[in-house]
Amino acid sequence: MGKKAPMWAPSKKELEKILEVDNVHELFLVGQVYIERILEKILEKKFNIPIEALDDPMIMWSQKYLILEKSGLLKGNVKKNVRLINNIRNRYAHRLKPDEKAIENNIRELEYLGVSHTNSITKFGKYRVCVISTFTALEKML
């Protein structure tokens, strides 16, 4: 038997489409899932970790993040964005009434990663742009 294929492979085109949602909860949850999936693809390629192991519920997001951070692959503003995107997701996933001020602060801290933008962009627009630019930066590691 060969390797079990992941349920889906992340793509920038799909990410751009799926982030065009009106539901804020969905926006933050889906954005983080895409980032986590690309982290898994990096771990699979760079460290030869089987996708079955990465899909196991015992392997937490923080473990994936730490492996990439401590190996030196995840650094600078990409690392910062990955952490902030996960923090935002956690605030929505683990609280009935998330602290909107804390979420706004996290979004404000996100970096555009070389993408041009306007100052009039909404916080949700900034989140979308930053998730896509972070995904693109991570994809270059493959």
Give residue ranges: language-model regions:
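Amphipathic alpha-helical interface elements
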Residues: M1-L142
